[in-house]
Amino acid sequence: MAVLQMQKLTICAMKKDRKAVLELLQKMGTVECIPDLEGTEVFKRMDTTSQRMQFEKNFSLAEQALEVLDQYDPVKTSLFASLAGKELIEADDLTHVVEQVGAIMTKVRELLNLQRRVSDARSLIQKKEAAIEGLKPWAALDVPMKCQGTAHTALLYGTLGPEYTQTLIDNALHERLPEVKAVTAEILSADKDQVCLAVVCMKKDAAAVEEALRAEGFARRLSVSERTPAERMAKREKEIREIESEISGLEEQMRAMASLREDFRRVSDYFRIRSEKYKVLGDLIQSKQTFIISGYILKRDAGPTVDRLNSRFDLM
C-alpha cells in the first residue's frame, strides 16, 4: 500500500467569503479540517452544537424513512450494487431540496408516524393473542367467571398443580371435608403446568372448601367480565381481524409513498452535508472580519487547491 505524503494547510480569508470558501472546500473534498487552532480574545470559536444536533436528527429521520420504504417497497438492485456506494447528489438536486425541505420533512414524519401506528397495532395484536392463550384453558366454562354462584351455591375457579387428576381432587376434598357432601370439582383443562378447575358447593361451605383446596395448592382465579371465556376469546379474535385490516391499510399508504424515495434520499444528503458544514464552522476560529481554518491535505493536491482558492477569494 502506497504511503501518500500529507501537508498541513491553514487558510485565512474574509468572513464575507466564509460560506463560499467552506462550500468549495466541501465540494472539492481534498482538505480534512481539524480543530487545532486555539481561540483568542480576537479570534473565537463558534458553538454550533445545537444546529448540528438538529441537522443530525433530521438526517436520522430521513434515513429511517428510507429504511421503511425499503421494507415495504424494496428497490430491486444487482448483487454488486451495495459495493458502488451512495450515488452523489447533484447541485441542482440540492437546490430543489432547499426549496422543498419543509414539505419533504413533513412527508418523512408522516411516513414514520404510519410505521409507528403499524408497530403499535402489532404490539396490540400480541397482547390480545396472549390474552386468548390465557383464556384457552377456561374455554370449556359456560358461565362468565364473574359469576360466583347463586343465592344458595358458590362457584370457585382456580388452578392446581399439573399432577392432580380428577380422582386425586375428589379424594382430597373427601379426606379434608368428610362432613361436606354437596361439593363437586370439574377439571376444565390440564397441561404440563397446571390443572384448571371449577368447584361448586353450597354457599355456607364455600370458605371451608376454598381452605381445603388451598391446602392442596389451589390458586383462585377472579374476573370481572360479564362474558364467558369463549365469548371473550371470540371478541379478541374479532378485534385482531379488525386491527390486521387497519395494518393492511396503513401499509398500503406507506407503499404509496415510495414515489418520494428520491426526495427522502436528497433531504438525507442535504442534512448530512449541513451537519458536516456546521462541524467545520465549529472547528474554525473567527474575528469580526476574518476567519481561519486549518487542516491536512495530500501534498499532490495542495497546489491545485490553493490555486483554486486564490483564484476566487482574497486569502491572507
What do these predicted regions represent?
Residues 1-316:
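Long, charged N-terminal accessory/stalk domains
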